[in-house]
Amino acid sequence: SDEMLEQFTREYIEAQTMNQVLFTWHGGEPLLRSIDFYRKALSLQQKYAGGRRIDNVIQTNGTLLTDEWCEFFAQNHWLVGISIDGPQPDHDHYRLTAAGKPSWKKVMQGIKLLKKHGVEWNAMAVVNAYNANHPLEFYRFFKENGCQFLQFTPIVERLTRHEDGRTLASLADKDEISLSEASVAPEQWGYFLCAIFDEWVR
């Protein structure tokens, strides 16, 4: 509700001890909220800023980006994080739409719009058992697309088997734990990081 957004904004700003306050919009898909929601958020931030600098960053899968969104981000100097897992075969191996369709082309269209409007963007890339096997192609893809900042998040997903036969991801502390097929093995993760470091440091 508007009341909850206002209360959160006021209390969050009041709780900060620095002159710069960062709002991070992340979790689920934040672009499912309307632009009007974020306009309201900006208005409330200014109302309660008290002379502090307010910055915003939003993490999105990029598939819902439009010219209107990108104009909003550009005008208000938002940093946009894009969730993209490398070249098309890597990304589409696991990142499918709700309808089970590949999503890479839509994400790349979103990145193109961000560039068109001069929006600062970076990438958050999930490293899984599939794309960890070709780290240089993975890294070079981001360089070629003008990504200045890149964050790697390795998948290590624990599974437990329940008595009814279902296997579910969990934070279980039982002995009968296995990892999902997408999980990166320790040696694989180490190889991935070392290969990219050797390329980057040159």
Describe the residue ranges of each PLM region.
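Structural preference for beta-strand elements that scaffold enzyme active sites
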Residues: 20-24, 53-57, 79-81, 120-124, ...
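Short intrinsically disordered, low-complexity coil segments enriched in acidic
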Residues: 1-9, 17, 181, 188, ...
